Amino acid sequence: MPQTDKQICIPPELPELLKQFTKAAIRSQPQDLIQWAAEYFGAMSRGEIPPVRERSERVALSNWAELTPELLKILHSRVGGRLIVQADELAQMWKVLNLPTDLFNSVMNVGRFTEEIEWLKFLALACSSLGVTIAKTLKIVCEVLSSDHDSGPPRIPFSTFQFLYTYIAEVDGEISASHVSRMLNYIEQEVIGPDGLIKVNDFTQNPRVRLE
């Protein structure tokens, strides 16, 4: 095979382009991610505005139930505490709740899930379709994961929050790993009590906690 000295040049703006693409995909939640990606980058190459739709602009079909934290809580209870769930089983649970198929497919595509799905990652991305910011997304996740038997504000183990915040920030792509680390260190050292739990108010009403 003939060799060539030609090198592939990666433009310095590529990482930022991919970050914006990922965020746009989460907001738009296309049913066919490949087709949508082709339209997205095609528009950018022509200097046009990419086909990004905000959640409020998506057409709600009357035969589908609207995704809500309450329905996600039901879905979480049916997962039954498992960390890994099979894609076909989760798809069936989703269908039974009459939730939009395009949203399920979008979460699968954005999360790059295959046959075995990490449930907390799937849940985080599903909640991101409801939350405008990372803080609001984590608030919804916390409410979904919090046990109904607990009195007081919703709360989850700090280790779970740490995993979710790190993952959501990574998918978002606009928050540095160093910022995430600083916030987590502050919360762990200054906020978390002996029970090892974090409450919603700990990261939504504390002026020193800025997740974004």
Swiss-Prot record:
Subcellular location: Cell projection, Cilium, Flagellum
Record note on modification: Sumoylated, sumoylation decreases upon spermatozoa capacitation conditions.
Modified residues (Phosphoserine): 56
CDD domains in the record: DD_ROP
Domain RIIa: 12-43
Keyword Ubl conjugation listed: yes
Record keywords, A-Z: Cell projection, Cilium, Flagellum, Phosphoprotein, Ubl conjugation
Gene3D superfamilies: cAMP-dependent protein kinase regulatory subunit, dimerization-anchoring domain (1.20.890.10)
GO cellular component, one term: motile cilium
Interaction with RHPN1 as annotated region, ranges: 209-212
GO biological process, one term: protein localization to cilium
Extra facts: 'Ropporin' comes from the Japanese word 'oppo' which means 'tail'.
Protein name per UniProt: Ropporin-1
Native organism: Bos taurus
